[in-house]
């Protein structure tokens, strides 16, 4: 049994297959495991996350829990406040690891927030069982799916304006929905915001102690503990290179089509229709002091959504989708050091990224970095003067680092419309490319983007079923 790609999904598939008794060999092109869930020393004595940073899906992932990653070195660290969303001339909106505490800070929207989120938070495991898998199946918890589906079908923009009366609650919904880099007027975009916020209130938005790479190192340790082998620096161009009858590919459609592999023509056509989304542009900052947020509460939040009101975030994401870089982009900021002081021996590390149009070229190097810095400065006056050093990673840089991030698309393919649900296309066997031979386990399969390993888990299930 061979697995190509040692990111979270590939390693999860390998771990489950090794546990089930398969002899598993994992082949990874890079010099270390991790894929887009990795970390490294970017500044002297400072560890930064190269891709994913905060992990609401990771800490709640059913398969990560089943694999008992904490036994293999993973430790979750929680900040005092999971998420903050600063606003102009108003207190920041705060998402606490508690439903009632969050709602009590939302003024006139307290009751509406409780009404919309209570079932999600109190039955989060049932909701995750429904959504972290193929959509074309009988849901394990149909009543819960119906309860979630009614508000989830809305656009985030419409639900925010209809359900809430004030900017704070609307902003919390919009910021979390914007993670998938889709205009907030699109159908189903409310679902992303609702689910991420429910996860934050139920189990938090923690970071991995020592860096996000600790998650994939723990997965690799599970693989090896059950007799699996991991080969690094191995670029696979043909399945004939692999000494295995069955292969799991933790790749997106473009990489699959570039391989020398026999696939049915209808599968090739389906993969060729795959659409990639906007890119991401990442900046790591080294500061000589904590971020001077105008609202001090934001200084206790592990994740910060920087973008202003719901309508402002919608305009920014719509602009990106239309091919224009907004002057005021939506920015995701992570302050991992608050929960994990081991991240830096001196100074303060801040991780930030924004969405950029697909194929975007900066008018000059550092232009997007300047826009991101300005947005943070808007809610943290004096931020710029705290910067000791900064390292930018463009969308093109992301793809060079990890070919699965095509055009800097960190979701493995657009999460807009039906492609968010039917990945990598319509069909009852999304993880099977060629039965008894080739399987797919990446963010291009359900449930899509996020560090949760569930695509790998479902692919492993398909292999075990067919074997």
Q: Language model features by range: what are they?
A:
Residues 1-126:
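N-terminal glycine-rich phosphate/pyrophosphate-binding loop and immediately adjacent elements
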Residues 52, 441-464:
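A conserved FAD-binding loop/helix module that cradles the flavin
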Residues 88-188:
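Rossmann-like flavin
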Residues 101-104, 254-258, 286, 345-375:
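Conserved FAD/dinucleotide-binding core of flavoprotein oxidoreductases
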Residues 195-237:
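Helical element adjacent to the flavin cofactor pocket in flavoenzyme catalytic cores
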């Amino acid at each position: 049994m061979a697995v190509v790609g040692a990111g979270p999904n590939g390693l999860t598939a390998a771990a489950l297959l090794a546990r089930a008794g398969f002899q598993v060999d994992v082949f990874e092109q890079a010099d270390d495991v991790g894929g887009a869930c990795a970390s490294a020393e970017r500044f002297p004595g400072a560890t930064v996350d190269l891709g994913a940073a905060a992990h609401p899906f990771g800490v709640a992932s059913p398969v990560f829990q089943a694999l008992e990653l904490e036994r293999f070195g993973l430790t979750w660290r929680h900040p005092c406040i999971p998420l903050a969303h600063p606003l102009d001339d108003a207190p920041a909106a705060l998402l606490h690891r508690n439903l009632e505490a969050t709602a009590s800070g939302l003024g006139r929207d307290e009751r509406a927030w409780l009404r919309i989120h209570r079932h999600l938070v109190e039955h989060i495991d049932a909701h995750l069982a429904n959504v972290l898998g193929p959509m074309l199946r009988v849901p394990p918890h149909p009543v819960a799916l119906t309860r979630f589906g009614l508000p989830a079908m809305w656009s985030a923009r419409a639900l925010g304006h209809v359900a809430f009366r004030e900017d704070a609650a609307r902003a919390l919904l919009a910021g979390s929905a914007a993670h998938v880099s889709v205009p907030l007027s699109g159908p189903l975009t409310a679902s992303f915001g609702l689910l991420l916020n429910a996860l934050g209130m139920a189990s938090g938005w923690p970071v991995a102690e020592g860096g996000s790479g600790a998650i994939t190192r723990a997965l690799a340790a599970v693989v090896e503990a059950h007799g699996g082998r991991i080969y690094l620096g191995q670029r696979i161009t043909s399945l004939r290179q692999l000494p295995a009858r069955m292969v799991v590919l933790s790749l997106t459609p473009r990489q699959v089509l570039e391989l020398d592999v026999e696939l049915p023509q209808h599968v090739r056509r389906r993969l060729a229709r795959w659409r990639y989304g906007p890119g991401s542009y990442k900046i790591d900052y080294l500061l000589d002091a904590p971020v001077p947020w105008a609202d001090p509460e934001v200084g206790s939040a592990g994740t910060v959504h920087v973008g202003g009101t719901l309508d402002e975030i919608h305009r920014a994401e719509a602009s990106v989708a239309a091919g224009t870089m907004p002057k005021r982009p939506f920015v995701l900021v992570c302050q991992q050091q608050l929960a994990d002081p081991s991240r830096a021996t001196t100074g303060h590390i801040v991780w930030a990224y924004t969405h950029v149009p697909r194929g975007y070229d900066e008018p000059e190097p550092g232009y997007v970095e300047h826009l991101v810095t300005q947005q943070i400065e808007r809610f943290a006056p004096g931020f710029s003067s705290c910067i000791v050093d900064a390292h930018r990673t463009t969308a093109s840089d992301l793809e060079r680092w990890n070919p699965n991030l095509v055009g800097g698309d960190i979701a493995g393919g657009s999460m807009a419309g039906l492609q968010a649900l039917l990945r990598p296309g319509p069909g009852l066997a999304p993880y099977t490319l060629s039965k008894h031979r080739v399987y797919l386990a990446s963010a291009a399969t359900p449930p899509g983007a996020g560090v949760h390993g569930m695509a790998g888990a479902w692919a492993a299930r398909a292999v075990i079923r067919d074997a």
